[in-house]
Design a protein with these regions (language model features):
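N-terminal "first-domain core" detector
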Residues: 1-60
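Beta-strand-rich solenoidal segments
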Residues: 5-13, 50-143
Length: 143
């Protein structure tokens, strides 16, 4: 398995701890962010074609941890015909009861003559943290 995560509250007794209780033991010791001395700190690098690889690393956000223990290949969505855009490789922490997971994925930007970085979701139960931004020029077939 490449991406693992924790701590989340129990649902139907599938966990025996309260997530906030478990995670709070790290308050004052670990600050939110990517741990810079683990692997390549989730560094994003171009691969072949429209692929990028997210490097090995560990993160701590919103009382949850994420471990990426192998290169994680992601496919950048196909470029636009006329307009450019900026995509974001993000780590998403989703504590909604129906989800309870951390994921690494690409958020597609809005095509424009002068593109801007996509906005990150920051709500009470869902947060997105950018790992890298990728400029996708019109008509390209590789990053």
């Amino acid at each position: 398995m490449s991406v693992t995560y924790g701590f989340y509250n129990s649902k139907n007794k599938d966990r025996r701890y309260d997530a906030i209780q478990m995670s709070s033991i790290f308050d004052g010791i670990i600050r939110d962010g990517i741990l810079q001395h683990v692997g390549t700190a989730m560094m994003v690098k171009e691969s072949t074609g429209m692929m990028v690889n997210v490097g090995i690393g560990r993160a701590w956000f919103n009382h949850t941890w994420t471990l990426n223990d192998a290169l994680l290949p992601l496919t950048v969505p196909q470029s636009e015909v006329i307009l450019n855009r900026i995509d974001a490789v993000i780590l998403e922490v989703d504590s909604r009861e129906s989800v309870r997971a951390n994921t690494i994925k690409i958020v597609k930007g809005t095509p424009a003559t002068n593109p801007v970085k996509p906005s990150m979701i920051k709500t009470n139960d869902r947060w997105q943290y950018p790992l890298a931004y990728i400029r996708v020029n019109s008509g390209v077939t590789s990053i």
